Amino acid sequence: MTNEEFLQRYDSGKPNFTKDEIEKMAYEEFGNWVDTAEGRTHRWYQEVETIFEVGDRLFAVNWDRGLTEQQENDFDDAEVYEVERKEKVIFTYIRKDTYGND
């Protein structure tokens, strides 16, 4: 599938991507990989979101990564959707030294 074919299918509203096509998106074999976000961890799998770029647009595919050698990666409920980059500021707190600065 070319970038143009992907965009045409996505913009049609009914892309019907195959499992193989979704796997390629998830495994960074289609488009330009941007980021991978690891989500909630369950007993046997972890939720994963792979972000990739096609042309000047950003897309994501969510899928489940198997956490043991007996668990396969799962794409049955995978979804492909367009995303946008947003800045997010996060504050963390560290312990303050309370024993003087000798």
What are these regions, as identified by a protein language model?
Residues 7, 16, 72-73, 93:
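Short linear motifs centered on Gly/Pro in flexible linkers and helix caps
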Residues 2, 18, 61, 85-87, ...:
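Generic cytosolic/nucleocytoplasmic N-terminal low-complexity/intrinsically disordered segments
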Residues 34-78:
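Acidic, low-complexity, intrinsically disordered interaction modules
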Residues 12, 43, 68, 88-91, ...:
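Sequence-pattern detector for short linear motifs
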Residues 1, 9, 33, 71, ...:
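Intrinsically disordered, low-complexity peptide-like regions
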Residues 73-102:
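Mixed-charge, Lys/Arg-enriched low-complexity segments
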Residues 2-37:
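Negatively charged, low-complexity tracts enriched in Asp/Glu with abundant Ser/Thr
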